[in-house]
C-alpha cells in the first residue's frame, strides 16, 4: 500500500486491488509463502530475499555468522515505511490467577529483567529505563531500535470490518495462488 502511496489502513476495494495487482505482478518470482521456514533458508543461503519480522531476520543473521558459511544477512525497513512490530502479554478475562499474571508481567517490566531479555533475544523492549542496561551493540542496532526518522514512517495495523477482512483474504489468496 505504501509503495503505491496508498493509506495502509484503507479498506477501499479499488485501492486494495491496486496493491494486490502489484503483488501479482511479482508472483512469478516468489518461491513460496511461509511464516517460519524462511529463517533457516535465509541463514543457509537457500533464500535471497524475504519479507519477515526483524527478530526472525536477526536470528537468521546470527545463525549465518555462527556457521561462518559466507552468507551475509541484512535487514532493511522500506523507505516508504512499514508496520510496527511488537509482542504483547495479555491476561485472559477469565484467568484463574490474574494476580500471579500481573506479578509476572511486572517482573518482566523491571529494567534489569527487560534489558536481560533484550540482550538475550535481540528484541527491543518497551521499558525506557532498561535502555541504558542493554548492550551497546544491540541498543545502537537500527534493526532492533530503528532511528526516529524511520520509526516516524511506521504504523500499526487497524481493525478492519468483516467485509474488508474477507476482501483481504480473497485478494491474498489470489496473490498466493497466482490467479
Feature-to-residue mapping (PLM):
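Mature extracytoplasmic/periplasmic domains
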Residues: 92-152
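Sec-exported extracytoplasmic/periplasmic mature domains
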Residues: 3-4, 24-31, 43, 47, ...
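Extracytoplasmic/secreted proteins, especially bacterial periplasmic and envelope-associated proteins
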Residues: 15-21, 25, 37, 41, ...
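Conserved C-terminal helix/tail region of periplasmic/extracytoplasmic solute-binding proteins
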Residues: 40, 148-179
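Periplasmic solute-binding protein
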Residues: 1-4, 86-90
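Solvent-exposed loop/turn segments at secondary-structure junctions
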Residues: 54-58, 80-83, 95-96, 112-114
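Ligand-binding pocket segment of bilobal, Venus flytrap-like solute-binding proteins
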Residues: 4-78
Amino acid at each position: 500500500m505504501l509503495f503505491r502511496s496508498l493509506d495502509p489502513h484503507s479498506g477501499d476495494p479499488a485501492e486494495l486491488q491496486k496493491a494486490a495487482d502489484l503483488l501479482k505482478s511479482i508472483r512469478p518470482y516468489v518461491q513460496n509463502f511461509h511464516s517460519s521456514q524462511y529463517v533457516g533458508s535465509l541463514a543457509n543461503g537457500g533464500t535471497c530475499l524475504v519479507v519477515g519480522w526483524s527478530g526472525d531476520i536477526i536470528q537468521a543473521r546470527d545463525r549465518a555468522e555462527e556457521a561462518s558459511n559466507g552468507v551475509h544477512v541484512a535487514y532493511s525497513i522500506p523507505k516508504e515505511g512499514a508496520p510496527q512490530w511488537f509482542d504483547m502479554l495479555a491476561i485472559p478475562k477469565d484467568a484463574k490467577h490474574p494476580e500471579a499474571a500481573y506479578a509476572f508481567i511486572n517482573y518482566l517490566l523491571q529494567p534489569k529483567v527487560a534489558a536481560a531479555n533484550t540482550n538475550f533475544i535481540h528484541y527491543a523492549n518497551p521499558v525506557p529505563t532498561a535502555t541504558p542496561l542493554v548492550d551497546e551493540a544491540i541498543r545502537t542496532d537500527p534493526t532492533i531500535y530503528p532511528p526516529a526518522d524511520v520509526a516516524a514512517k511506521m504504523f500499526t495495523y487497524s481493525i478492519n470490518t468483516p467485509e474488508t477482512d474477507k476482501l483481504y483474504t480473497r485478494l491474498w489468496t489470489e496473490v498466493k495462488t497466482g490467479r
